[in-house]
């Protein structure tokens, strides 16, 4: 015990330290705030799909401290960009979430803070170790990397035959509206991304998902028709995400408006799924991660070194 204490005092075996931890009262989602060795803060989320430890368990990891993309509906973008995370810092999120929660997840999504494809090398290294038989031994089908549309990295990902699932944050098919909410549109237009995917993606073995945050101004019948024209092949799946509350100043759609949009897409045979927003009450859902301590009831653990 004396030796263990001396080692703990002199050496750190983890790249991150637990700063805060909070549990959703709605659905069992758990959010973790970690501190890096140089004093930055990042967040990870454990999503219990059916609210228990028995069903699908997904860990959402961050790839950057902050984010440089500035998407209007995302709290992370308001922080600005600090730096890329190292592979060890990405992997440590998974290690610590598993250790602290006592569960073994079966899915990982790179959908936390940051733009994964602006940290391409480190993200791919971390994903490879997650898949490696002497690492976490997760199936490549259980690892998903999301991007807002960094065209050169998407092409590189496909050309290198990376086996992981790919998710594109689409959110608008109208380039004018998309540029208003997603500045990346000005550099890498979604029409160009769609052309690349149409040319190269069908011959790859990857699964492609388009993520679409439903706002009140992007779920019209014309939006549905543009979606069908732009992605007219059956090898994509559209994942619809209701806009979550935040200080973005955008109007949330009603259930009736979202249902009508879903029906418009289904009539046109667009493969659609609707993502349940997990952890809304703890600011742990899509677009809500801000790298700050949570100040409300529901906390399960606070502070301490992991």
Describe the predicted segments one by one.
Residues 1-57, 301-306:
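Flexible, acidic/Gly-rich N-terminal and inter-domain linker regions that tether
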Residues 24, 62-63, 146, 169:
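Short linear Ser/Thr-Pro motifs
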Residues 276-282:
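A short, acidic, flexible beta-alpha connecting loop/helix-capping segment that sits on the rim
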Residues 295-299:
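Secretory/periplasmic and organellar redox-cofactor proteins
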